[in-house]
A protein has these predicted regions:
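Structural motif
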Residues: 17, 52, 180-182
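Secretory/extracellular carbohydrate-interaction modules
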Residues: 19-145
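Ligand-recognition surfaces built from glycine- and aromatic
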Residues: 50-52, 62-64, 118, 198-245
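Short, aromatic/His-centered strand-loop micro-motif at the edge of beta-sheets
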Residues: 112-126, 146-171
Length: 245
């Protein structure tokens, strides 16, 4: 795994795993600590086409500013550009399957009927190209709401809010295959969806905590940036096991 941290963030190896932390700070700088297995690779060579991921995890608070989580994605926005030595990647439509926490400033959904904040089990499945991308791009300068509605027809997504005390240790398991995505908490199936990223588009594992927010609301409002951390925050994990199927 690649181990990375921005300024005012840290990664610490523990007896059974890792502790990823970000320091107390204002909303002027990005703070991120992460583990991944893809950031040195071009997107077409990301390592996984189906996987089972197991770990135990807890965080400092159930209401942290920013985002944190663990799972797989295609790094659609080239976010690893924030770290030196990472390859350039053009933006892409999202493909992801993950346990994802988003503070209230975030809204990462392209439909109006799925939860997009709090602690979620979430999946996105997108094509490489779709004819509706052309009118979506043309509509963006004039109507962000129309663009969002068109993207909602292109990007398949599914999510479920999870009722879990994330400040306590829990076991999490994610199963991704071409036909389904399944999310387990303490060996109990918490969510299952037929919306699953195509195996033809490989994904990479990411485990992270940061102070970032991004939103594309149902009203068409776009927002992104970084948030203040009134207190230090950390994500601790142990017993990480990744099995490619």
């Amino acid at each position: 795994m690649n181990v990375k941290a921005t300024q005012n963030a840290s990664t610490e190896k523990t007896e059974k795993g890792w502790r990823l932390g970000i320091q107390k700070g204002d909303s002027l700088s990005y703070r991120d600590a992460q583990l991944d297995d893809y950031s040195l690779l071009p997107r077409r060579k990301f390592p996984h086409r189906s996987i089972t991921l197991n770990l135990r995890a807890k965080v400092t608070s159930s209401s942290l500013p920013g985002t944190w989580g663990f799972g797989l994605w295609n790094d659609p926005f080239g976010l690893s550009l924030g770290f030196g030595g990472s390859p350039f990647r053009l933006p892409a439509l999202p493909n992801a399957v993950w346990f994802f926490y988003a503070s209230p400033q975030n809204y990462l959904s392209f439909t109006g009927d799925k939860p997009a904040q709090g602690f979620l089990a979430q999946t996105f499945r997108s094509p490489i190209f779709h004819p509706l991308l052309i009118p979506a791009g043309l509509a963006l300068p004039f109507s962000r709401k129309a663009t969002r509605n068109l993207l909602g027809k292109i990007i398949a997504e599914d999510s479920s809010a999870l009722s879990v005390d994330v400040t306590q240790w829990h076991g999490y398991r994610l199963e991704w295959s071409a036909k389904r995505s399944a999310f387990w908490v303490d060996d109990v199936l918490a969510f299952e969806s037929p919306v699953s990223p195509h195996a033809s588009r490989p994904l990479g594992v990411i485990i992270w905590i940061d102070n970032q927010f991004a939103a594309f609301t149902p009203e068409g409002k776009i927002g992104f940036g970084v948030l203040e951390n009134p207190e230090p925050a950390w994500l601790e994990l142990e017993d990480l096991k990744i099995v490619s199927v």
